[in-house]
Curated annotation (Swiss-Prot):
Gene Ontology biological-process annotations: cell surface receptor protein tyrosine kinase signaling pathway; modulation of chemical synaptic transmission; negative regulation of neuron apoptotic process; nerve development; nerve growth factor signaling pathway; neuron projection morphogenesis
Protein name (database record): Venom nerve growth factor 2
Record carries keyword tRNA-binding: no
Annotated Basic and acidic residues bias: 47-66
Source organism (scientific name): Tropidechis carinatus (Australian rough-scaled snake)
GO molecular function ontology, one term from the record: lipid binding
Tissue spec: Expressed by the venom gland.
Family according to the record: Belongs to the NGF-beta family.
Cross-referenced InterPro entries: Cystine-knot_cytokine, Nerve_growth_factor-like, Nerve_growth_factor-rel, Nerve_growth_factor_bsu, Nerve_growth_factor_CS, Venom_nerve_growth_factor
Pfam families per the UniProt record, alphabetical: NGF
Disulfide bonds: C139-C205, C181-C233, C193-C235
Keyword Hydrolase applies: no
Length: 244
C-alpha cells in the first residue's frame, strides 16, 4: 500500500515539472516576453498620443494673475444695478465719452441720449466765478468732471472705484463732478475770504466734501458705496479775540 502511494506521488511531481510555464514565469528574452513588451510599448505610445491630444483640446489654465487682470479690465455689470433711482446722483455720471463742462455762465444739461446712463437726470452746474450785477463769490472755486480710481468710503476705508464697466457690450466710464477751491493754500493768511472784515475776523477758504453713491469693487463683484468727493469751496471765519 505504501509503495502505491509513493508511486502516485512521484507521478504527480513528474507531471507538474513537465507542465508548460505561465507567462509570469517566462524568462526574459523569450518570445512571450517580447510580445508583452511590444504590447506595453504600444499602449504607452497610445496613452501619450491621447494625453497630447487632450492638452491641445484643453489648454493649460491661465495664471491667477492673468485671470485677475482680465477680469479687472473687462468687468460686466448687471443692468439691474441702475434701475433703482436712489442710487442716482447728479454728481455721478456713466458715459461712453467725456461729459461737457459749463463755460461762459452756461449751465450743463444732460439730456436723454444713448451715451449716458443717467437718462433721468438733468444736472445743472455753473463754473465759478460768476459775475452778475456786481456779485462776487466769497471764495473762488473750480469745477470739473474727474475719474477716480480710489476713494474713502463712509466708514473711512479706502476702496477701489470702478473706472470702466461693461454694460450690454458697451464700455462706460464713471465720472464725478467735483468742486474745489481755485487756489488752495496751506497758509490761512494767503487764502483769506473775499469781503470779510479782517480787523474782526480771521478767514480762509477751504474745500469741503460730501458723500455720493458710486460703483465700487468689493472682492470680485460690483457694489454701490458712499464715497467722499470734493463738492464746494467755503469760507471759514474765526472771531479775533484780541479786540475783545
Amino acid at each position: 500500500m505504501s509503495m502505491l502511494c509513493y508511486t502516485l506521488i512521484i507521478a504527480f511531481l513528474i507531471g507538474t515539472w513537465a507542465a508548460p510555464k505561465s507567462e509570469d514565469n517566462v524568462p526574459l528574452g523569450s518570445p512571450a516576453t517580447s510580445d508583452l513588451s511590444d504590447t506595453s510599448c504600444a499602449q504607452t505610445h497610445e496613452g501619450l498620443k491621447t494625453s497630447r491630444n487632450t492638452d491641445q483640446r484643453h489648454p493649460a489654465p491661465k495664471k491667477a494673475e492673468d485671470q485677475e487682470l482680465g477680469s479687472v479690465a473687462n468687468i460686466i455689470v448687471d443692468p439691474k444695478l441702475f434701475q433703482k433711482r436712489r442710487f442716482q446722483s447728479s454728481r455721478v455720471l456713466f458715459s461712453t465719452q467725456p461729459p461737457p463742462l459749463s463755460r461762459d455762465e452756461q449751465s450743463v444739461e444732460f439730456l436723454d441720449n444713448e451715451d449716458t446712463l443717467n437718462r433721468n437726470i438733468r444736472a445743472k452746474r455753473e463754473n465759478h466765478p460768476v459775475h452778475n450785477q456786481g456779485e462776487h463769490s466769497v471764495c473762488d472755486s473750480v469745477s470739473d468732471w474727474v475719474i477716480k480710481t480710489t476713494a474713502t468710503d463712509i466708514r473711512g476705508n479706502v476702496v477701489t472705484v470702478m473706472e470702466d464697466i461693461n454694460l450690454n457690450n458697451e464700455v462706460y466710464k464713471q465720472y464725478f463732478f467735483e468742486t474745489k477751491c481755485r487756489n488752495p493754500s496751506p497758509n490761512p493768511v494767503q487764502s483769506e475770504c473775499r469781503g470779510i472784515d479782517s480787523r474782526l475776523w480771521n478767514s480762509y477758504c477751504t474745500t469741503t466734501q460730501t458723500f455720493v453713491r458710486a460703483l465700487t469693487m468689493e472682492g470680485n463683484q460690483a457694489s454701490w458705496r458712499f464715497i467722499r468727493i470734493d463738492t464746494a469751496c467755503v469760507c471759514v471765519i474765526i472771531r479775533k479775540t484780541d479786540n475783545f
